[in-house]
Amino acid sequence: MYAVFQSGGKQHRVAEGQTVRLEKIEVAPGESVEFGDILMVSNGEDVKIGTPFVSGGKVTAEVVTHGRGEKVKIVKFRRRKHSRTQMGHRQWFTEVKITGISA
């Protein structure tokens, strides 16, 4: 069984027991979180597609950890001016383990 849900402006296809990285959620590690914006649920033979969301659909997950992603380097370079700016960015994420899918 798998589901497609929406979190942090992105869509994620998940199955039970899978670990996925989402945009940062303000929930402590070890706590449970529910996602209600379910776009699609499939159990192999039945497929429920929401318009836009599946009514009564729910994905439950347990927060594993919070962290920061890999560094993305931003370089601004002006030719012939001896001018260069370098910056970096590391996006915060929350890693969750999917514990249940219901439709």
From Swiss-Prot:
GO CC annotation terms, alphabetical: cytoplasm; ribonucleoprotein complex; ribosome
UniProt xrefs under Pfam families: Ribosomal_L21p
GO molecular function list: rRNA binding; structural constituent of ribosome
Classification via PROSITE patterns: RIBOSOMAL_L21
GO biological process: translation
Alphabetic keyword roster: Ribonucleoprotein, Ribosomal protein, RNA-binding, rRNA-binding
Keyword Ribosomal protein recorded: yes
Domain of life: Bacteria
Family of the protein in this entry: Belongs to the bacterial ribosomal protein bL21 family.
Self-association state and partner proteins as the record states: Part of the 50S ribosomal subunit. Contacts protein L20.
Protein's job: This protein binds to 23S rRNA in the presence of protein L20.
NCBIfam families, alphabetized: L21
Protein name (Swiss-Prot/TrEMBL): Large ribosomal subunit protein bL21
Species classification: Bacteria, Pseudomonadati, Pseudomonadota, Gammaproteobacteria, Alteromonadales
